[in-house]
Amino acid sequence: MFSWLGNDDRRKKDPEVFQTVSEGLKKLYKTKLLPLEEYYRFHEFHSPALEDADFDNKPMVLLVGQYSTGKTTFIRYLLEQDFPGMRIGPEPTTDSFIAVMQGDVEGIIPGNALVVDPKKPFRKLNAFGNAFLNRFVCAQLPNAVLESISVIDTPGILSGEKQRISRGYDFAAVLEWFAERVDRIILLFDAHKLDISDEFSEVIKALKNHEDKMRVVLNKADQIETQQLMRVYGALMWSLGKIVNTPEVIRVYIGSFWSHPLLIPDNRKLFEAEEQDLFKDIQSLPRNAALRKLNDLIKRARLAKVHAYIISSLKKEMPSVFGKDTKKKELVNNLAEIYGRIEREHQISPGDFPNLKRMQDQLQAQDFSKFQPLKSKLLEVVDDMLAHDIAQLMVLVRQEETQRPVQMVKGGAFEGTLQGPFGHGYGEGAGEGIDDAEWVVARDKPMYDEIFYTLSPVDGKITGANAKKEMVRSKLPNSVLGKIWKLADIDKDGMLDDEEFALANHLIKVKLEGHELPSELPAHLLPPSKRKVAE
């Protein structure tokens, strides 16, 4: 008797088993989170319902910046080819949102056709109306970079009233819609004319719930000298500190992302290193895409729960017959108190609550009599999903990550930075002398030999203790010197001959110049007398 109670309880505790992360996210959303969203009209307040394409699409990169900061040129630099609809110039050229995506043939799909395509993740943009859809296109082209990621180019942010009035649609709301769905948001600034307008500040604030996705690029940095660049960088960090309210510092990449010669080449090495870091960040997106989607679903579930508590609290406070309008105004004005009460009753973090002013504005237009009371079962299902099913999916996420290559984005600008003499760091540090016929250490060997013969060699070798006395003079930590010893002691006899000692000193010099040590000794650094032994 009542055995079905036990079965239901057991079913609730056992998390579902999924084949892929994408399939699991889709099923969890449709069966567990969507019913809660629909019951409390979540989509009217926050974000449209998710579709299959939102879970299946490639990682997307959103570029945001004021006009003429180099957004379109940046995409052209990554792809190493023009894309349909591309316009570049010092004036505000890009007047549309352009989704640059992989396609078999070059072409443009207009916005109205794009939002009815179930395979594209843009169907819910339909809500922004014709004024926006006439300014939204998809540029398709065959390109190796676009096989792994898609890029969203945005119109330059204007100053003054034009930004809000002449566009005909809510620009900040559209950006927020994209920000929820993309994997990386890149804010571009022009180092030559650094200016953060009030409109740009508002846009950055609209993206404030997505700081984890944000990266900053200080572009066109080759147009100013080192001293000016330091001042511009400091000014940018100060300005961002006032707009982005996070204790962590947003990562800023400095460079010149176009294929023209550097105007002031003083900081070439810095630009190359920064470009490599940015490319590595973009290349990691396909590998981390499943984790990002899982993270976004958890974020959405937490907001949906808070929204349910807010709506049900408002419903509970409303009178059944008289004085509804007066009570509605009173509740909207006292929303901060309702937030505080929900926070205390349900132990919810203040960061999970929606923006107070925005919520008040939205509630003004709502009919409170249509709100639903608290339905515990819907919330329990979401709690169960967060506690059990998400943990199961995390295991699957890790499995999928290990099966994927570390750097999945290939082609375009990503290809030229990997190999050959123009690869990053080629011929520098431990790579110095890689193409030379002569052993690179031989240049300084006479100087190292003088030191070697003062360390009392026996049968042409010095002991580890004597070598240590000399090596610690470099003031490098023991962990680094230990690694250098392992690399230099090629025959592993615990002693160093003159060539091995010279090699150890060469590696110390490499480290002192700020380069990383190799994990294994490169072939060109092997002393000539040891090359046959190593083979």
UniProtKB/Swiss-Prot annotation:
Residues 65-72 are annotated as: G1 motif. The keyword Transport applies. Residues 444-532 form the EH domain. It is a peripheral membrane protein. Residues 91-92 are annotated as: G2 motif. Keywords: Acetylation, ATP-binding, Calcium, Cell membrane, Cell projection, Cilium, Cilium biogenesis/degradation, Coiled coil, Endosome, Isopeptide bond, Membrane, Metal-binding, Nucleotide-binding, Phosphoprotein, Protein transport, Transport, Ubl conjugation. One of its GO terms (molecular function) is GTP binding. It comes from the Eukaryota. Residues 153-156 are annotated as: G3 motif. Homooligomer, and heterooligomer with EHD1, EHD2 and EHD4, ATP-binding is required for heterooligomerization. Interacts with PACSIN1. Interacts with PACSIN2. Interacts (via EH domain) with MICALL1. Interacts (via EH domain) with RAB11FIP2. Interacts with ANK2. Interacts with CACNA1GG and CACNA1H. This is EH domain-containing protein 3. It comes from Rattus norvegicus (Rat).
